[in-house]
């Protein structure tokens, strides 16, 4: 994860 809003931009970082 990055900060919280970046996970939304990056689906692969969502989980």
Curated annotation (Swiss-Prot):
Details of cofactor binding: Divalent metal cations. Prefers magnesium or manganese.
GO cellular component: cytoplasm
GO biological process, alphabetically ordered: protein homotetramerization
Top-level lineage group: Eukaryota
MF GO annotations: magnesium ion binding; malate dehydrogenase (decarboxylating) (NADP+) activity; manganese ion binding; oxaloacetate decarboxylase activity
Keywords carried by this UniProt record: Cytoplasm, NADP, Oxidoreductase
EC number per UniProt: 1.1.1.40
Substrates-to-products reaction catalysed: (S)-malate + NADP(+) = pyruvate + CO2 + NADPH; oxaloacetate + H(+) = pyruvate + CO2
Compartments it resides in: Cytoplasm
Keyword Cytoplasm included in the entry's annotation: yes
Cofactor(s) required for function per UniProt: Mg(2+); Mn(2+)
Family: Belongs to the malic enzymes family.
Biological role stated in the UniProt entry: Catalyzes the oxidative decarboxylation of (S)-malate in the presence of NADP (+) and divalent metal ions, and decarboxylation of oxaloacetate.
Subunit structure: Homotetramer.
Protein name: NADP-dependent malic enzyme
Species this chain originates from: Gallus gallus (Chicken)
